[in-house]
């Protein structure tokens, strides 16, 4: 990770479910730490739980909802 790359910190407020062909991805709703009124849905690979802090390299992309 380059030190000049802008990153955004986001807090996991709700775990929505597992997705991916083998369930290896978790869909979560995150709240930005700088702007707490803004929330988006993201896909996260690896272990994650509520109140975890994520470092988002790209903060505009939102995941499609689970069916």
Swiss-Prot record:
PTM description: N-terminally acetylated by acetyltransferase NatB.
Recorded coiled-coil stretches: none
Molecular functions (GO terms): structural constituent of ribosome
Modified residues (N-acetylmethionine): 1
Keyword hit for Acetylation: yes
Gene Ontology CC terms: cytosol; cytosolic small ribosomal subunit
Subcellular location: Cytoplasm
One Gene Ontology term from the biological process aspect of the record: cytoplasmic translation
Keywords for the protein's UniProt record, in alphabetical order: Acetylation, Cytoplasm, Ribonucleoprotein, Ribosomal protein
Signal peptide interval: none
More details: Present with 8600 molecules/cell in log phase SD medium. There are 2 genes for eS28 in yeast.
General function of this protein: Component of the ribosome, a large ribonucleoprotein complex responsible for the synthesis of proteins in the cell. The small ribosomal subunit (SSU) binds messenger RNAs (mRNAs) and translates the encoded message by selecting cognate aminoacyl-transfer RNA (tRNA) molecules. The large subunit (LSU) contains the ribosomal catalytic site termed the peptidyl transferase center (PTC), which catalyzes the formation of peptide bonds, thereby polymerizing the amino acids delivered by tRNAs into a polypeptide chain.
Subunit-level organization: Component of the small ribosomal subunit (SSU). Mature yeast ribosomes consist of a small (40S) and a large (60S) subunit. The 40S small subunit contains 1 molecule of ribosomal RNA (18S rRNA) and 33 different proteins (encoded by 57 genes). The large 60S subunit contains 3 rRNA molecules (25S, 5.8S and 5S rRNA) and 46 different proteins (encoded by 81 genes).
Family named by the database record: Belongs to the eukaryotic ribosomal protein eS28 family.
Protein name in the entry: Small ribosomal subunit protein eS28B
Source organism: Saccharomyces cerevisiae (strain ATCC 204508 / S288c)
Gene name tied to this protein: RPS28B
């Amino acid at each position: 990770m380059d030190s000049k790359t802008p990153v955004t910190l986001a807090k996991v407020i709700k775990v929505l479910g597992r997705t991916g062909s083998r369930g290896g991805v978790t869909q979560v709703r995150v709240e930005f730490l700088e702007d707490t009124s803004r929330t988006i849905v993201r896909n996260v690979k690896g272990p994650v739980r509520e109140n975890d802090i994520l470092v988002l390299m790209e903060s505009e992309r939102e995941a499609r909802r689970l069916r």
